[in-house]
Amino acid sequence: MGSFLGINVVSISVTDLDRARAFYRDVLGFGEPLYDLAEAGWIEFATGGPGNISVTLAEPGWQPSFGTTVVLNVADCRSAAAELRQRGVECDEPTVFPGFVTFASFFDPFGNRLQMCSPAP
């Protein structure tokens, strides 16, 4: 096709927009939302790189998916994992693939799996 230019936004379903706003803004540190349209069920955050993350109000009966995972770039995965733990987030110990990547998984308050990664030593 060749007409796609990149990722604009990745949308994550949540069941409570106020809790989602607090988690993504304060715990993950994305700052104030770019767009806060809670009345429409949508809040969008800048990630600090190309592509944004939005949280959208889920339909009744929604369950989190583990098949699709948002992976966020960080400068140092080990330090970022430790910081998330200090903020009360359950976070896996980082896994290192030497010469390739260090990554760790964690979950938002709604059960959505997220990961972070940094270059491996």
Each model region followed by its residue ranges:
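N-terminal beta-strand motif that seeds the catalytic metal site of vicinal oxygen chelate
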Residues: 1-21, 68-70, 120-121
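Conserved short beta-strand elements that form part of the metal-binding/catalytic scaffold
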Residues: 31-66, 113-119
